[in-house]
């Protein structure tokens, strides 16, 4: 607690050194006995209220807002400012509980209400049917690369993977340790700039495959499935890594056996992994499956088998509430399409000064990679953009160039500012 009695750094009182009666009081810098604290502890209040309040959809413009940058990072990524402000207001005292969410027992009634509401709001957002289970897990989407085959098939089960980028490739390689994986299509030879046709002309599915796996949006290369393939096996099902476009648009959950996503790109901070899995697929884990990867263990314990990432789940809940307040995912998708169109138009209308290599039909609404015709200027572009408070525009190390990640929480104003900068930069260097 800061005390305003003096501008001296000695106002931390006894924190500086323990009392020693042998020392000269003048040397230990104790304040006089008649010193009075202007703001005693008993007068500290918290802006949080005992009852739950909706996250405001209007971002408060103040000095803090003006000091914030436009963050185009791929993840962890920008969060809605009004959500951050809501979390700030509840940090010390969550809704009259007298404690922070960070301090709560994960088995207490307070956190139970938080995780239950987060799940309920997510179910509303995605219209998740009752025959699907929602799990809040840890370990990132990368851990699910192992958990999925361990839970959904035997070591001899055939499974198909469509590889449209680095994450799909990593998922297939990891799954090969636990199942008979076939990468039935890969875009690697084309540098992952497209998605195959589903009419059977470009790949052939195994009719016995237990599941078909896709990465719905490849963060690094900026390719996104606009429609989804149907497994050739009538008893098979579709599995999707939706980490980087989760809750960015409506999705028919019933078309999937399992959806998984790391939260840190679109719905929260890093540390939370969300799995949406059809109930009949739970309970068939291979014997070798570690307890922390067993969906049944987590489902039976309502994501509380061990201590979950409580604060991360709380933040996800605030984001879900905010998305609902915006009108749901139909409205969110409209905003995302508008933002992406502004940026892609600027690239396409630059007469080749900027280039996006991805086929237009599958360009991501979330991650926009682009290069400069004069590649030697890319470093200057990134540095000058940072001076204008637009950060994290450097492309992935495996690709180079630039990448603007424009997730749900990136406002249109951020994209418009980037486009204005791009035009100015082009005029200067064309």
Swiss-Prot record:
Cite the binding residues for L-glutamate.
107
Q: How is the cofactor bound?
A: Binds 1 pyridoxal phosphate per subunit.
Pfam families, per the entry: Aminotran_5 (PF00266)
Q: Where in the cell is it found?
A: Plastid, Chloroplast
A Gene Ontology cellular component where this protein is annotated is: cytoplasm
One Gene Ontology molecular-function label: pyridoxal phosphate binding
Protein keywords: Amino-acid biosynthesis, Aminotransferase, Chloroplast, Plastid, Pyridoxal phosphate, Serine biosynthesis, Transferase, Transit peptide
What is its cofactor? pyridoxal 5'-phosphate
Range annotated as the organelle transit peptide = 1-51
User: Which Enzyme Commission number(s) are on file for it?
Assistant: 2.6.1.52
Q: Which InterPro entries match?
A: Aminotrans_V_dom (IPR000192), Aminotrans_V_PyrdxlP_BS (IPR020578), Pser_aminoTfrase (IPR022278), PyrdxlP-dep_Trfase (IPR015424), PyrdxlP-dep_Trfase_major (IPR015421), PyrdxlP-dep_Trfase_small (IPR015422)
Query: Where, in this chain's numbering, is pyridoxal 5'-phosphate bound?
Result: 141-142, 167, 219, 241, 264, 306-307
Q: Which CDD domains match?
A: PSAT_like
Catalyses which reaction? O-phospho-L-serine + 2-oxoglutarate = 3-phosphooxypyruvate + L-glutamate; 4-(phosphooxy)-L-threonine + 2-oxoglutarate = (R)-3-hydroxy-2-oxo-4-phosphooxybutanoate + L-glutamate
Provide the top EC class: transferase
State its role.
Catalyzes the reversible conversion of 3-phosphohydroxypyruvate to phosphoserine and of 3-hydroxy-2-oxo-4-phosphonooxybutanoate to phosphohydroxythreonine.
**Subunit note:** Homodimer.
The identity of this protein, by name, is Phosphoserine aminotransferase, chloroplastic
Native species of this protein? Spinacia oleracea
């Amino acid at each position: 607690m800061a005390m305003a009695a003096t501008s001296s750094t000695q106002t931390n009182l006894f924190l500086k050194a323990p009392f020693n009666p042998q020392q000269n009081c003048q040397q230990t810098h104790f304040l006089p006995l008649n010193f009075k604290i202007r703001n005693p502890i008993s007068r500290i209040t918290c802006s949080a209220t005992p009852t739950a309040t909706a996250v405001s959809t209007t971002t408060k413009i103040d000095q803090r807002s003006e000091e914030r940058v436009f963050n185009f990072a791929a993840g962890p990524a920008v969060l809605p400012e009004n959500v951050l402000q809501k979390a700030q207001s509840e940090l010390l005292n969550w809704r009259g509980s007298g404690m922070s969410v960070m301090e709560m027992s994960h088995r207490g009634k307070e956190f139970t209400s938080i995780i239950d509401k987060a799940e309920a709001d997510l179910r509303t957002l995605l219209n998740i049917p009752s025959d699907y289970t929602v799990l809040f897990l840890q370990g990132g989407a990368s851990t699910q690369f192992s958990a999925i085959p361990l839970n959904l098939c035997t070591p001899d089960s055939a499974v198909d993977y469509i590889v449209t980028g680095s994450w799909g490739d990593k998922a297939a390689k990891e799954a090969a340790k636990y199942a008979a994986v076939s990468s039935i299509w890969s875009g690697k030879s084309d540098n992952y700039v497209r998605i195959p046709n589903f009419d059977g002309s470009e790949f052939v599915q195994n009719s016995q495959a237990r599941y078909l796996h896709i990465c719905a949006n490849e963060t690094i290369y900026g390719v996104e499935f606009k429609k989804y393939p149907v497994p050739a096996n009538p008893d098979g099902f579709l599995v999707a890594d939706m980490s980087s476009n989760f809750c960015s648009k409506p999705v028919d959950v019933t078309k999937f056996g399992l959806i998984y996503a790391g939260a840190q790109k679109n719905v929260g901070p890093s540390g939370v992994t969300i799995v949406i899995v059809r109930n009949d697929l739970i309970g068939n884990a291979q014997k070798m499956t570690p307890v922390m990867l067993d969906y049944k263990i987590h489902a039976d314990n309502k994501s509380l088998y061990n201590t979950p990432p409580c604060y991360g789940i709380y933040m996800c809940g605030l984001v879900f509430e905010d998305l609902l307040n915006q009108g749901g995912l139909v409205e969110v998708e409209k905003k995302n399409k508008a933002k992406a169109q502004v940026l892609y138009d600027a690239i396409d209308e630059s007469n080749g000064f900027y280039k996006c290599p991805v086929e237009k039909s599958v360009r991501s609404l979330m991650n926009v990679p682009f290069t400069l015709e004069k590649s030697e200027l890319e470093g200057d572009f990134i540095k000058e953009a940072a001076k204008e408070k637009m950060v994290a525009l450097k492309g992935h190390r495996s690709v180079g160039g630039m990448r603007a990640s424009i997730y749900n929480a990136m406002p249109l104003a951020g994209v418009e500012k980037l486009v204005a900068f791009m035009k100015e930069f082009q005029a200067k260097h064309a």
